Amino acid sequence: ETFYRDETGDDSLFEDEFLRPQIDDYLRFFYWANDKLNLANFGDTPDRIVKHQHVIYYLSYRFDCKKLFDRQDLMSDGPNEYEDFLFYPLVLALKDHGYPDPPLLGICPHTGYAMCRTGYGKNDRFFAIKTGESWNHNHLDAGSFILSDKNMEIAIDSGTCNYGRAEYRGYYTTPQAHNIVLLNGQGPDADMIESGTKFS
């Protein structure tokens, strides 16, 4: 947020009209598989559950949304990192105000994600797709998707790889390492690998 504000002079990232929609976006990313609640994981972040936890705690507290905290709490073992402990005691006191589930179809235009589902229960179908550019991601994975149905994962993204391994540049960042549909055996142009969405 500081980098963005310094580069653009725009300090709106912490205003309610920007942050409140993030609750629905996070709620859309949760899905059931193997009797566990999961968070759709595109890319090479090893543990989305931990990496986003303090953000979910903050949003839950700021907008009094116990539903968001409860879903995160089903996935995690509680606070893990310093930032988590800043908000965890606050979210424990939240009361359930019946925050509605977001619509079954959701598009995040600024990140290029889209999700659709038949519902929010364990046996509902969930589909998410990653499109467009991703700032600082550097994988040729536009079009990769996640699909689950009846509490089972059917298609997931490829997971993580150590940056130091030869396979990282040679294979892992290529379209073939991701579950995307290739056209005539081809995916996104290799020249795009170093370009991401920039602020200026």
Label for each model-derived stretch:
Residues 2-155:
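Carbohydrate-active enzyme catalytic cores, enriched for enzymes
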Residues 140-200:
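Active-site rim segments in enzyme catalytic domains, especially the processed small/beta chain
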